[in-house]
């Protein structure tokens, strides 16, 4: 759940940045209404229960209502949606409007089977992409902590040039406070 909350809180901070752009023709205080965060979990048995607890704390997941079979047919996935008003930081502390967090529209897709990453991408583009018809899609792996303005800069690349079909951001290792993580050979 720490990796999930790290990523999700980073996304929430980015949405707050979009909403802080009061002089923008596109964004502004209600900019959060133009953004939908889709979280796709690859297999009900594979997702960590504490990650589900974090999603429940955000209001987007309800434990105990998902069924394997409905009307004698196997269920492929469970879809939950909610507009959350709070975020959970890496320390599992709630952050809300008092810390600059704005509402966030969320869709949580809990796949029954673990069918790997490409199948999750297929779900995102074929199911949610077709329904939402977004102008820009940004894919993040769990554990990635986007800088507070990173998603805005990715969006801006598409907005400024209609010929841009893809963009990538820079990934930097988290060095930790006082660069303590550099003592870990996997980070350094």
From Swiss-Prot:
Spans through the membrane: none
Catalytic function, reaction form: [(1->4)-N-acetyl-beta-D-glucosaminyl](n) + UDP-N-acetyl-alpha-D-glucosamine = [(1->4)-N-acetyl-beta-D-glucosaminyl](n+1) + UDP + H(+)
Protein name: Chitin synthase 2
The organism of origin for this protein: Exophiala jeanselmei (Dematiaceous fungus)
Top-level EC class as recorded in UniProt: transferase
Key word Cell membrane present: yes
Record's function text: Polymerizes chitin, a structural polymer of the cell wall and septum, by transferring the sugar moiety of UDP-GlcNAc to the non-reducing end of the growing chitin polymer.
GO biological processes: cell wall organization; chitin biosynthetic process
Entry GO CC: cell septum; plasma membrane
Pfam families the record matches: Chitin_synth_1
Known EC number: 2.4.1.16
Annotated PANTHER family: CHITIN SYNTHASE, CHITIN SYNTHASE 2
Family: Belongs to the chitin synthase family.
GO MF annotations in UniProt: chitin synthase activity
Localisation: Cell membrane
Keywords, in A-Z order: Cell membrane, Cell wall biogenesis/degradation, Glycosyltransferase, Membrane, Transferase, Transmembrane
Its membrane topology: Multi-pass membrane protein
